[in-house]
Amino acid sequence: MLYRLLRPDENIENGLMATDPLSDTTVFQHVCKKTDSTLKSKFISTCGSLQAVLAFKGDIPNPIIVKIWEKNLPVVRIDLRTKENRNKYCTDANNFFHDEAMLFQLVLLVGYVPETHVELYTPSGLLE
């Protein structure tokens, strides 16, 4: 199970797509994009746990969080939760990259996530 904080322009009835599926953005650039909010990417960021997506949402008021069912999900997954996998995309000791990926248990998806694999997550108290 993966979790995602939806962008304001996303609607799960249409499935999920990256901001620019044809982008040449690298995994490293995508993870470090906080320095460039205009960066369009071919990756869909997800978190590997509910706790991680709650940390990711920070102070965002009224967040919309979804669950993504991984079974038979027709996308490429780039799981950055382990150091071994992170080192494939960042060979130096870039603390920001590694810290972000670990803190938010990042799993990047490449491709279209069909609406059949996405479900709203709205437990009581989450949106307070």
Predicted regions located by residue number:
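NAD-dependent ADP-ribosyltransferases
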Residues: 1-128
